[in-house]
Amino acid sequence: MKRLLELDARLSARMRVAESPGMLRSVAVVLAHSGDSWFWWAGLGLLWWLGGPFWRPWALAVLYSILALAAVVLVIKFTIRRRRPEGEWGGLYRKTDPHSFPSGHAARVVLIAILAIGFGPWPLAVILCVWAPLVALARVAMGVHYLSDIIAGFVLGALAGVIALQIFAH
């Protein structure tokens, strides 16, 4: 297991972008934050408030799914207790959530993409399916997760998405 964790750390370190300002780093920062839970809670709240008969149940299903997934992620994180990679960026994450496994961001974005595939509309599903892996990779690029964290998050988010589709199927 130790060798696997060392390989994970080496691969993750290769994926990191420089700490100095630049276009790639700026894009990675925006992508990494676009999966933040507060952003999605606010957006889904607005969608429910302003949306019509299609969007209101959509927003509630996604919100309830995100909340349930967050609880599962927290239980796993505080059971495994894997420390985040060392680094400068993400001080808020490092203080409020020092554990990296699994990536809650990766789990959340995959869950959202799968729900969009199931509920539609299809153009949104396509956009979210492109966006989700970019968010997850940006988390590694910014140094707040290891590659295995986002892989586990993807698996967890996909499983949660399939379950949520069964629960919220119309």
Regions found by a protein language model. Give the residues of each.
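Membrane-water interface at transmembrane helix exits
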Residues: 48, 72-81, 117, 165-169
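Hydrophobic alpha-helical transmembrane segments
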Residues: 35-48, 130
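Small-polar-interrupted transmembrane alpha-helices in polytopic inner-membrane proteins
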Residues: 63-78, 125-137
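Residue-level signature of the transmembrane alpha-helical core
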Residues: 30, 45-46, 63, 129-133, ...
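Membrane-helix interface segments
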Residues: 21-24, 53-58, 85-86, 120-126, ...
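Membrane-embedded catalytic cores of phosphoryl/pyrophosphoryl-handling enzymes
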Residues: 89-170
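Interfacial segments of alpha-helical transmembrane regions
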Residues: 44-72
